[in-house]
Amino acid sequence: MKISDVRSKAFAMPLTSPAFPMGPYRFVDREFLIITYRTDPDRLREIVPEPLKVTEPLVHYEFIRMADSTGFGDYTESGQVIPVEYNGQPGGYTLAMYLDDHPPIAGGRELWGFPKKLASPTLHVNTDHILGTLDYGKVRVATGTMGYKHKELDIVEQAKRLAGPNFLLKIIPHVDGTARVCELVRYYMQDIVMKGAWTGPASLELSPHALAPVADLPVLEIVEARHLVADLTLGLGEVVYDYLAQ
């Protein structure tokens, strides 16, 4: 293969059969269970990277079911998102996500900088409630429940919340083990079509694990729970801060 061919074809690895395709990345009937809880503010400040700022001692714990996604297939994801500000702009910082499908793990890490790891999350309706779980290996590290569709939420307001900015810390090492890329990335959900939004009584239990430390941000109080269904496109990102250039 000629050098010019390598340059023109280079997108992702392996060169001749990339682990994930080029976008756009559209999700149909993407289902969320988002349980917002109050936690220890000191622990939040320890893990949220500057120039992001912690605004409230809150965490959004998310279980996301994605049965129909272009290029990524059928998978489920779970993890923690922290409300933050960047230069006065409110948004969410993704701390870690755990999922069960290689293409979105590879694509998420390489394209955007999503902090994704392989695990076994689930999200489904269990009789009268919606149930989210996360297993890391043989250990159950998260269990979330919410009464099924107890009360409708304003879908316009929920669409606005989904459309807000999201932030990621993208880290890619050089071949010598030093940081080659260390950037704060911002991205948005686009072309959102809300199909439903509900709330209800909720619970969240987090258990310690050395490699899936979701319990490091302890649940002190449940603040809000939302069950959402939407079609949306995962927009590509932009670098808002380069740690290596400063």
Swiss-Prot record:
The keyword Lyase applies. Keywords: Decarboxylase, Lyase, Schiff base. GO terms for molecular function: acetoacetate decarboxylase activity. It is an enzyme of class 4 (lyase). Its EC number is 4.1.1.4. SUPFAM superfamilies: Acetoacetate decarboxylase-like (SSF160104). InterPro entries: Acetoacetate_decarboxylase, Acetoacetate_decarboxylase_bac, ADC_dom_sf. The active site is at K116. It catalyses: acetoacetate + H(+) = acetone + CO2. Belongs to the ADC family. NCBIfam families: PRK02265.1. HAMAP family: ADC. Catalyzes the conversion of acetoacetate to acetone and carbon dioxide. This is Acetoacetate decarboxylase. It comes from Burkholderia multivorans (strain ATCC 17616 / 249). The gene is adc.
